[in-house]
Regions:
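Extreme N-terminal starter segment of soluble prokaryotic enzymes
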Residues: 1-4
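Short hydrophobic/aromatic beta-strand micro-patches
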Residues: 6, 55-57, 97
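Active-site microenvironments that recognize anionic phosphate/pyrophosphate groups
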Residues: 8-14
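Flexible, gly/pro- and Lys/Arg-enriched active-site loops
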Residues: 12, 41-50, 60-66, 71-124
Length: 124
């Protein structure tokens, strides 16, 4: 399976994005990474976010990979008891899953947010 992951951070963003890419390289193969996009916080007042999309191959199914992503987020100090729109050490979401040329999963975030669609375009 080919997965495309959206990564974002606005707390120690450079460090947390570097940590995430290092960890993701351990569980994915053939990794490619978009350029980093700086975006304003959306839905709350806060520091700018660094966003990118990372693509890689994995034998893990969607749920197993998602569990791994949550573990990486938690390792960065991610707090889950805060409002949806708030500062983040790290946010990693599966935005696209392909099996060959077939789309298995496509997140609505691709159409909703330029900070997802723009870096994704670089990799597709």
């Amino acid at each position: 399976m080919k997965y495309y992951l959206s990564l974002g951070s606005n707390i120690n963003a450079e460090e947390n994005i570097a940590f995430a890419t290092e960890e993701l390289n351990k569980i994915l193969s053939n990794v490619t990474i978009s350029s980093t996009h700086k975006t304003k916080a959306e839905g709350f007042e806060g520091d700018d976010f660094l966003n990118l999309v990372l693509a890689g191959d994995s034998e893990l199914n969607f749920d197993s990979l998602n569990k791994e992503l949550k573990t990486i987020e938690d390792s960065s100090g991610r707090k889950r008891d805060v409002p949806k729109f708030s500062a983040r050490t790290l946010d990693i979401d599966i935005v696209l899953q392909l099996d060959g040329d077939e789309i298995v999963f496509e997140s609505d975030e691709i159409k909703k947010y330029l900070f997802v669609s723009e870096p994704l375009k670089e990799l597709i």
